[in-house]
Amino acid sequence: MAGFFQQVTEYTRNAISAGKYLLQGLAVTFDHMGRRPITVQYPYEKLIPSERYRGRIHYEFDKCIACEVCVRVCPINLPVVDWVMNKETKKKELRNYSIDFGVCIFCGNCVEYCPTNCLSMTEEYELAAFDRHSLNFDNVALGRLPTSVTTDPSVKSLREFAYLPEKVFDPHEVLPTEPRAGKLPEEVLDWMKAETTDKKVMESSSNNFKEGDKP
């Protein structure tokens, strides 16, 4: 009889332990159900790149003076600059300019050291191709401006992944009912413009007040 009660007690203890572990697992599941989504449904949704994002290089042919500074500062001597010397003007004439993005490491040295600012980094990062030779962009392909994520009608940009509110270090701490994590870049610009306008109004009013005090 004592053995029977011992078996019942052990079975009950095991059942309670199993239920506790089951509830712990469900608690983790329910905790993640209330969190904000992190996964991006690419390519239907895209994150907005940062302001200084180093994407595909944009090239302006008319500004280039064929100085080849970009070639000298490139860690792998990647840009190919084809030019000839004009004997009449004694100046370089640019014929062709190309960059192979299959080899480029996007360090941004060429953009930083260009004396005429003919090179700039764009927000374009979709450079996948079936043929690696198609990644060798000439001056015509480099001159095309990319389509911005914020203006592309076929893409829903995730604007809620902007700046976090003050004193918030974890995006999951933001309530799910809130539409986004922080201010949008457009709202930040509007706030800066409004602040600049207020400063100008205050300065003009102070100047008028000083002029009124003069005899």
UniProtKB/Swiss-Prot annotation:
The keyword Ribonucleoprotein does not apply. [4Fe-4S] cluster 2 binds at C74, C104, C107, C110. Signal peptide: none annotated. [4Fe-4S] cluster 1 binds at C64, C67, C70, C114. GO terms for biological process: photosynthesis, light reaction. Its cofactor is [4Fe-4S] cluster. Coiled coil: none annotated. It is a peripheral membrane protein. It comes from the Bacteria. GO terms for cellular component: plasma membrane-derived thylakoid membrane. It catalyses: a plastoquinone + NADH + (n+1) H(+)(in) = a plastoquinol + NAD(+) + n H(+)(out); a plastoquinone + NADPH + (n+1) H(+)(in) = a plastoquinol + NADP(+) + n H(+)(out). Keywords: 4Fe-4S, Iron, Iron-sulfur, Membrane, Metal-binding, NAD, NADP, Plastoquinone, Quinone, Repeat, Thylakoid, Translocase. It is an enzyme of class 7 (translocase). Binds 2 [4Fe-4S] clusters per subunit. PROSITE patterns: 4FE4S_FER_1, 4FE4S_FER_2. Residues 55-84, 95-124 form the 4Fe-4S ferredoxin-type domain. Its EC number is 7.1.1.-. It is found in: Cellular thylakoid membrane. NDH-1 is composed of at least 11 different subunits. PANTHER family: NAD(P)H-QUINONE OXIDOREDUCTASE SUBUNIT I, CHLOROPLASTIC. NDH-1 shuttles electrons from an unknown electron donor, via FMN and iron-sulfur (Fe-S) centers, to quinones in the respiratory and/or the photosynthetic chain. The immediate electron acceptor for the enzyme in this species is believed to be plastoquinone. Couples the redox reaction to proton translocation, and thus conserves the redox energy in a proton gradient. Belongs to the complex I 23 kDa subunit family. This is NAD(P)H-quinone oxidoreductase subunit I. It comes from Prochlorococcus marinus (strain MIT 9211).
